[in-house]
Design a protein with these regions (language model features):
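Short glycine-aspartate micro-motif
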Residues: 6-8, 33, 96-100, 124, ...
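Metal-dependent amide/peptide-bond hydrolase catalytic core
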Residues: 103-108, 115, 122-335
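Acidic/histidine-rich catalytic neighborhood of metal-dependent amide-processing enzymes
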Residues: 37, 41-116, 178-185, 331
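Short, flexible, mixed-charge acidic loops at enzyme active sites
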Residues: 18-28, 116-119, 183-188
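A structural signal for isolated positions on well-ordered beta-strands in alpha/beta enzyme cores
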Residues: 8, 65-69, 169, 236
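Acidic/His- and Gly-rich active-site-bordering loop/insert found
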Residues: 1-38, 54-62
Length: 335
């Protein structure tokens, strides 16, 4: 009716597993379901649907302002991101509050509330050097070669970058006489000989930050490290900011307080804030600048992104009740 808070519900339909992954099929053992995507995010989508059905049965949807966005490329966002997430970003600008239905988080056996998600940024390092017989390596003519320069750079990342709420990883590396990524940069073909100084080396990885300022600061430090070339080498670092951060905010904490009021009324334990290091990146971050938000409204489970991923089907009623009551109360809170 335009009077209450406008809600945006976010889930996704894809899974992280590639088509040729050996982890396939679905099985159920009591309340445990095992299969690719059962928790991330099929189970969350089911919780969302169950909550909406409960609201419909109670007549609570009649005056609620709720929009649902289910993406199909959350695990590997399309390019360019500005196009792939244009509809989601637009929905965020129409909303007051966003609820993310990915997996419920736990710590020491307790359900946790998530009010933040870190960014996801990928980088590609390309290093060139002189080539020649290995007997001349480290000479003025040949220098250190591309692989030693790459090793220096990634070791400097490890030693110089660490700070709170930051993680960074080298996921793929190779070098030699030749080195080339495939189109998706998930495979790398390299060739070389032990008596030839390598002229090329490649690496790719990611880094994750809690806010935009940390992203800018870390990217600048990485570029400065790359610029300190070893003799007779050159290197470039390309950085793509794939998922923005969702920093913890006062508005997000207030939402968690509202959820804990629901927990109290349901006789459930209060949910403390989850450490942001406990979650990966996600779609809600694209609307974090425009809305208050909560993460982890979905199913309880384990093993996300790994063979044996599981979901606790018995958690669906609990999570659906939490979501339905919270959404009803928010939808009746004046804007």
């Amino acid at each position: 009716n335009g009077k209450g808070k406008r809600l945006l519900l976010i889930g996704h339909l894809d899974t992280v597993f590639e088509a040729d992954d050996p982890f396939v099929g679905f099985r159920r053992e009591g309340d445990e379901a095992v299969g690719p995507g059962v928790g991330d995010d099929k189970g969350g989508d089911v919780v969302m649907l169950a909550a909406l059905r409960a609201m419909q049965a109670a007549g609570a949807l009649r005056d609620a302002d709720i929009e649902v966005v289910l993406t199909g490329d959350e695990e590997d966002v399309g390019s360019p991101v500005s196009v792939a997430r244009a509809d989601l970003i637009a929905a965020g600008k129409r909303a007051d509050i966003a609820l993310d239905f990915e997996n419920l988080s736990h710590s020491h056996g307790r359900d946790m509330g998530s009010i933040a998600r870190r960014s996801s940024n990928t980088w590609v390092l390309t290093v060139h050097g002189e080539s020649g017989h290995s007997s001349g390596i480290f000479s003025d003519e040949l220098g250190d070669g591309a692989i030693f320069e790459l090793a220096r750079i990634v070791a400097a990342f490890r030693n110089e970058l660490p700070e709170p709420n930051l993680t960074f990883n080298v996921g793929l590396v190779g070098g030699g006489q030749t080195a080339e990524f495939d189109a998706g940069k998930t495979h790398l073909a390299a060739s070389g000989k032990d008596n030839i100084v390598p002229p090329i080396a490649l690496a790719r990885g990611d880094f994750r930050t809690l806010d935009a300022e940390q992203t800018r600061r870390v990217a600048a430090k990485m570029q400065a490290i790359v610029a300190r070339h070893l003799p007779r080498t050159d290197a470039t670092l390309e950085i793509d900011e794939n998922y923005p951060p969702m920093p913890p905010t006062a508005g997000n904490r207030a939402l968690l307080a509202r959820l804990n009021e629901v927990n109290r009324d349901l006789g459930l334990a209060p949910m403390d804030e989850l450490d942001p290091l406990g979650r990966g990146a996600g779609d809600i971050s694209f609307v974090a600048a425009d809305t208050d938000g909560l993460v982890g409204m979905g199913i309880s489970g384990g093993g996300s992104h790994a063979a044996g991923e599981s979901a606790d089907l018995g958690s669906i009623p609990r999570q659906a009740k939490r979501a339905a009551i919270l959404m009803h109360r928010l939808a009746n809170t004046p804007r």
